[in-house]
Amino acid sequence: MMAAERRIQPGELRHWEPMARYTSWRAGGPAERLYRPAGLADLVAFLRRLPEDEPLFWCGLGSNLLVREGGLRGTVILTQGGLDALRVEGEQVHAEAGVACGRLSRYCIRQGLAGAEFFAGIPGTLGGALAMNAGAFGGETWSRVRRVETVDRHGVLRRRGPEDFRVGYRHVSGPAGEWFVAAVLDLEPGDAQAMQARVKALLSQRNRTQPIGEPSCGSVFRNPPGDHAARLIEAAGLKGLRRGAAQVSERHANFIINTGGATPADIEALIEQVRDEVARRHGVTLVPEVHIVGEAQS
């Protein structure tokens, strides 16, 4: 395999790297610079070398990210595969931001610690889950957070508690110019076999109702208060709606799938069309969960 075709390695910096390789939609323009740190100390050293005005973006599994065809100017920090340390101390789990949520759930179950089972249903990394208070199966990320560790663009690390952040439904705000690099989660003892059985049942139900295995970002829109985005989209008759090779899933209306060769422009146009049509028919303006970044193709 040629070097240009393989995925970036820990400690490696690439220029104009296609982000389609690192997003769950399998679509996206290039990053001017893409860096995957070889651990937290390496990340700190890298950030200290960056120019003061360098734009910074963060990416885990790319499961809630759409990069326009014109790409991203600046540097993208790829945490998955770089910040992936996990350890347990008593009833607390220390996890870095690049740890996939599914891996985190499995690790906690193996350790006999309950409370993290819901992470099995989050298709991203812990860093992304912290940034948006991601949830699944009735659980939310920040309900388990004891403290977090952040880094700023100068490579300064800080420990912070939940009191430093405003946390809501799929929204987190806190100190400006800081990004999550790790967290400590509070859990409690549980029966590993029972937890495994519960997660298996929940994932089986999810697989029956969601287009798992097809390129998507997971849920496209937040649920509005007292309702479900999928219900509103389906009631508007939008299941199966297409724009280019992007399609509203026939299985779950709050998923947009890449049926093969969809461009970021296809996906963004379909998101806008669904949002506008739901607003016209139901008087509800849906708010996207997905982050749309980068420049349109000139």
From Swiss-Prot:
Protein's GO biological process: cell division; cell wall organization; peptidoglycan biosynthetic process; regulation of cell shape
Highest rank taxon of the organism: Bacteria
Cofactor(s) named in the record: FAD
EC annotation from Swiss-Prot or TrEMBL: 1.3.1.98
Pathway where this protein functions: Cell wall biogenesis; peptidoglycan biosynthesis
Domain FAD-binding PCMH-type span(s) in chain numbering: 26-190
InterPro entries: FAD-bd_PCMH (IPR016166), FAD-bd_PCMH-like_sf (IPR036318), FAD-bd_PCMH_sub1 (IPR016167), FAD-bd_PCMH_sub2 (IPR016169), MurB (IPR003170), MurB_C (IPR011601), MurB_C_sf (IPR036635), Oxid_FAD_bind_N (IPR006094)
Entry GO CC: cytosol
Keywords assigned by UniProt, alphabetized: Cell cycle, Cell division, Cell shape, Cell wall biogenesis/degradation, Cytoplasm, FAD, Flavoprotein, NADP, Oxidoreductase, Peptidoglycan synthesis
Keyword set includes Cytoplasm: yes
Catalytic activity: UDP-N-acetyl-alpha-D-muramate + NADP(+) = UDP-N-acetyl-3-O-(1-carboxyvinyl)-alpha-D-glucosamine + NADPH + H(+)
HAMAP family listed in its UniProt record: MurB (MF_00037)
Functional summary from the UniProt entry: Cell wall formation.
Protein's UniProt name: UDP-N-acetylenolpyruvoylglucosamine reductase
